[in-house]
Amino acid sequence: MDPRNSLQENAIFQFEQLTYNASYHTEEAVKNFLEGTFMNSSQNAPETSMKFYHIFWSIGAEENRQVSPFHLAARVLQEQGEGTSPLISGTYPGYEHYYNYFNVGASGSTNEEVIRNGLNYAKDHDWHGAYYSILGGAEVISASYIRKGQDTLYLQKFNVSPTASN
């Protein structure tokens, strides 16, 4: 596999480094990134007094995590689209106040099974509210990929690192 074959406008971002960089991962940049999405700055994230952009920026910048807030936000947008999934509603019967923005553990053969498995994961990990769901998802991404040397989407998809296990 020659990565030079992917140096095209629609594929280049798979080589972006996913670790935090204070010089361009600013809170204002994350705010601008989220404009026009269901996570824009017009309202607080569910069950918190914080805006989504502040959550992504502050969680990504934490020293032990060091994850690009752009990557976290883009991953949520990829998983949640318009933001209408029961996995992030906080109102699903039996799972009130639990959220799973990254769809971690959300698998199954029916929509109902996918939702329940994802919300079971959120409940088991105490992801109550948007903040704790994003914090938990960021930790999964950091521990499972980035801290194991897979800090680009390319390296996550094509594991070429002998120290990584994914």
What is each residue range found by the language model?
Residues 27, 31, 53-57, 69-73, ...:
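Extracytoplasmic/secreted envelope proteins and their assembly/folding machinery
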Residues 57, 77-80, 92, 97, ...:
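Generic hydrophobic/packing signal
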Residues 54-84:
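Short, functionally critical alpha-helical segments immediately adjacent to catalytic or ligand/cofactor-binding
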Residues 23, 27, 45-53, 65, ...:
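Solvent-exposed, acidic/flexible segments
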Residues 85-92:
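Short, solvent-exposed loop/turn and secondary-structure capping segments
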Residues 7, 18, 34, 72, ...:
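Generic detector of leucine side chains in alpha-helical contexts
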Residues 1-65, 146-166:
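Cell-wall glycan-active module
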Residues 1-7, 94-166:
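Non-catalytic cell-wall polysaccharide-engagement segments
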